[in-house]
């Protein structure tokens, strides 16, 4: 998932990123594994949703125009987007999340703690990129922050099931409905 950026990308990275490509692949994969353990086991929000969003964001980046990909999202940023996708709903139903204005801010705090405690060496610019991407998944209209390419891409990846084939869409819609409205018994009507 993370082995996308060329070696020269790390060589051109800011001096504070002093590790090798292999280091980042291992570090990001480890971080994504730890993120998956922070996901609840709800009908919609669960580790499978994390994996779906990670895959969808990679597919969306591939859809960018050929001349737009390097300018809008670099290969390094594509890997950062996959990492943001891994953390975007981490801790979704933790009681501690209630102390934050949004569950996305809690997910960002969890991600930053993971990066720090595992000594994953990223620049402040990279951390800000991850932060903006995750904030792009905020659903409350008054709090939405989708004014950057990374925020827009992660938001659309988070909602990708809505544009999938009918079976995938319906499965996602039912899971989301069951999670959001557990008090309403029964399945959605057949269409």
Please report, for each region that a protein language model flagged, where it lies by residue.
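Histidine- and acidic-residue-rich, metal-dependent catalytic cores
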Residues: 53-57, 104-144
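Hydrophobic/aromatic-lined pockets within catalytic cores
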Residues: 91, 95, 112-120, 161
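Eukaryote-biased recognition of C-terminal alpha-helical segments
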Residues: 23-24
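Alpha-helix N-cap and loop-to-helix initiation/capping positions
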Residues: 99-103
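His-Asp-centered metal-binding catalytic motifs of divalent-metal-dependent phosphohydrolases/nucleases
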Residues: 53, 76-96, 107, 130-138
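Active-site flanking loop/helix segments enriched in acidic
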Residues: 27-56, 90-96
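Divalent metal-dependent phosphate-bond-processing catalytic cores, especially two-metal-ion Mg2+/Mn2+ enzymes
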Residues: 2-16, 41-77, 87, 139-191
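Amphipathic alpha-helical interaction segments
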Residues: 64-67, 92-97, 118, 141
């Amino acid at each position: 998932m993370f082995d996308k950026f060329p070696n020269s990308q790390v060589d051109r990275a800011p001096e504070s990123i002093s590790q090798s490509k292999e280091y980042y692949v291992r570090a990001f994969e480890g971080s994504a594994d730890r993120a998956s353990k922070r996901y609840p086991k709800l009908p919609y929000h669960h580790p499978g949703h994390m994996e779906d969003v990670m895959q969808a964001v990679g597919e969306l980046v591939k859809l960018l125009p050929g001349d737009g990909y390097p300018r809008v999202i670099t290969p390094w940023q594509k890997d950062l987007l996959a990492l943001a996708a891994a953390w975007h709903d981490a801790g979704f139903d933790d009681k501690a999340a209630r102390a934050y204005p949004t569950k996305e801010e809690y997910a960002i705090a969890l991600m930053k703690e993971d990066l720090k405690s595992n000594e994953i060496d990223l620049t402040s610019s990279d951390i800000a990129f991850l932060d903006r991407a995750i904030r792009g998944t905020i659903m409350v209209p008054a709090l939405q922050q989708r004014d950057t390419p990374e925020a827009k891409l992660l938001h659309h990846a988070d909602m990708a099931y809505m544009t999938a084939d009918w079976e995938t869409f319906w499965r996602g819609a039912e899971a989301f409905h069951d999670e959001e409205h557990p008090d309403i018994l029964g399945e959605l009507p057949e269409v």
